[in-house]
């Protein structure tokens, strides 16, 4: 007998697309898609989303084709978010949409790129990839004749900027000025938690990057399976895989361990979230926002294990000499280009040069920052070569 289709009833605190707070600019509704599904499709069709395929997480593209890029990471986050939202009875389209958007504002070369742009923009308003993501979807993407940005629903925008929790403590930072300005016109409730769907997207990001960094670290030879045996969470899982499947080679052993670790983290989030929902008595999406704590979360034991896993990854991967060397090269590339473009804006491409005109120095710096932040790793390397290596003239 065939199994019945998997079905979880809609949770009372799930977002209801038919009750969306709408879009900043009024549009006719789609006859074939919910508002949240429409947001998802708009994000997928952006140039910023396409460029994620050549923006890297830790390893620069020329180091190999087997490592994650921002695009593959984003797709993994979206898959986990959609599955987790479905299992919790939440709106899967909204969770997936926020997951797909969450990294759109990342510059080339991962966190090294963000660190360098923050330094270069320190006197001009700063740089924050979350704010840049918000600006991408509300300002920098211009694909429609009647408005700038993507005109996403209120719920998606709220999730983009608040998926990690309330942000009022950040509003004093110069880099968050754009958020404060937008909030004055289109209130996003920056002092409250976001929807359960947005919180799912945030946890899906944690699940995806912790697991794929273990995977990429082993693949790159930065650490071995034996090194992982004493690390919380992954160590016991590896031991179980080796005991149960001694026939597996090292590659399949570590892949099976990563698969089980994803499952363990998903199960933990589900159990903790359902416990918190029952304990708090939430009955609506607004009840979720009114809580003084996250609804979607890891258990305290899992959170502790993940903190120790991240500590291991920080020491053995993120600060490995090979990664440090790449970070140094990446920061030099972006820093030198930023200084040149700010000093000589006439060498910017025509469209960007036009944007830089009739602005003060801070305004020109923001245009330069936007141009660089939108680059892929490969394009940044090539642009730097053209600008600074005279051998290209030969």
From Swiss-Prot:
Composition bias type Basic and acidic residues, residue spans:
25-36
Which InterPro entries does the entry link to? dGTPase (IPR006261), dGTPase-like (IPR050135), dNTPase_2 (IPR023023), HD/PDEase_dom (IPR003607), HD_domain (IPR006674), HDIG_dom (IPR006675), PHydrolase_assoc_dom (IPR026875)
One GO biological process term is: dGTP catabolic process
Superkingdom is: Bacteria
Q: Which Pfam families match?
A: HD, HD_assoc
Q: Which residues form the HD domain?
A: 70-210
Q: Which CDD domains match?
A: HDc
According to the record, the residues making up region (Disordered) are: 1-36
Q: Which SUPFAM superfamilies match?
A: HD-domain/PDEase-like
Q: Which UniProt keywords apply?
A: Hydrolase
MF terms in GO: dGTPase activity
HAMAP family given in the database record? dGTPase_type2
Which NCBIfam families does the record associate with it?
Answer: dGTP_triPase, HDIG, PRK01286.1-1, PRK01286.1-3
UniProt cross-references to PANTHER family, sorted A to Z: DEOXYGUANOSINETRIPHOSPHATE TRIPHOSPHOHYDROLASE-LIKE PROTEIN, DEOXYNUCLEOSIDE TRIPHOSPHATE TRIPHOSPHOHYDROLASE
- Homology family: Belongs to the dGTPase family. Type 2 subfamily.
Q: What is this protein called?
A: Deoxyguanosinetriphosphate triphosphohydrolase-like protein
- The species is Caulobacter vibrioides (strain NA1000 / CB15N) (Caulobacter crescentus)
